Amino acid sequence: MSFELPSLPYANDALAPYMSAETLDFHHGKHHQTYVTNLNNLLKDHELQSSSLEDIVVKASKDASMTGIFNNAGQHWNHILFWQCMKPNGGGPIPSELEGRLNNDFGSVEQFKEAFIQAGTTQFGSGWAWLAIDNGKLVVTKSPNASNPLVDGMKPILGCDVWEHSYYIDYRNKRPDYLKAFLDSLVNWEFVASQLD
């Protein structure tokens, strides 16, 4: 099986001013494409070449000899979710089922947002901030580099890339501002809610 770079579900200038066309051109067209190309090259004649992307991520995470496969498969999986988690004119009202779950598991939507921004801000170096389902409960977590909650048996439903290439053109070193803009103005809450099942 060969993996392909998915098309963005919006025009590359549609997320401005919160994420510029320049950022998307580099992030999607260069960085994400490189992960896909590297993954396909690493999987040639490999026992995992016909496995699903999710299976590759989980299996490669448990085997140090597959670090290259894990890094590129993880980044490919993470970015597929990341692109879907955003939309033009995002943010806004959260669907009632998801809002209820956030209120129940975090105390309030605002407390969830604070926890998410804190996770992304305190992720040292490159990585991701996540909202995931862990044994039926919504949790905020973070992961370094290409890792994600799948490797810990959780289901990620919202992910934000905190590698510098995801925000440095638009926000420079202001990662908290990027995370706030992501939650308030970019997130496709309908998509996130659809992942609850």
What are these regions (language model features)?
Residues 1-197:
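Feature for soluble, non-membrane regions of globular proteins
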